């Protein structure tokens, strides 16, 4: 699979949110079995939903974190903690999102989420997160 086989708008948004390194790894690992799924998520999740004008990316990241904490999907949560930093959320805001979600998703889900967030934040030196220099309003244009 190559970039040219994926939805261009979805691929652009996916790269902006997750970073080139992550997206390149995902594309490189694509097999004939997973190719339809890569096409689907790039078109539907990134090209349609994440590109909509109704919410900025910072808000979408907050919602995504809460959903992933609830679902207890640690691999996806790790990826989206990084995306949340890239989209301008602070470590303190990420902590508050997990704490707030604990009320509705349960303490075990939040406990696992805090462990994932702590690991990601320890891997990211302070001030080097993409959003550290000031979050840019990245609302998608129509």
Predicted regions and their residues:
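Acidic, glycine/proline-rich low-complexity segments that act as flexible tails and inter-domain linkers
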Residues: 1-58, 86, 112-142
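A short structural micro-motif
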Residues: 33, 69, 87, 100-107
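Short alpha-helical scaffolding segments that buttress acidic/His motifs in well-ordered protein cores
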Residues: 41-45, 62-69, 97-102, 113
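Mid-chain, well-packed structural core segment of small domains
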Residues: 62-65, 69-95
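Substrate/cofactor-recognition hotspot
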Residues: 76, 107-108
């Amino acid at each position: 699979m190559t970039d040219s086989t994926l939805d261009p708008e979805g691929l652009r948004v996916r790269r902006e949110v997750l970073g080139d390194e992550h997206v390149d790894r995902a594309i490189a690992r694509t097999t004939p079995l997973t190719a339809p799924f890569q096409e689907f998520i790039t078109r539907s999740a990134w090209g349609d939903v994440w590109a909509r004008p109704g919410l900025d990316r910072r808000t979408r990241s907050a919602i995504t974190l809460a959903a992933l904490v609830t679902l207890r999907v640690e691999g996806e949560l790790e990826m989206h903690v990084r995306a949340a930093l890239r989209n301008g959320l602070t470590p303190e805001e990420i902590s508050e999102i997990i704490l707030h979600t604990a009320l509705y998703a349960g303490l075990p889900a939040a406990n696992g989420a805090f462990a994932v967030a702590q690991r990601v934040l320890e891997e990211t030196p302070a001030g080097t997160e993409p959003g550290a220099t000031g979050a840019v309003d990245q609302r998608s244009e129509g």
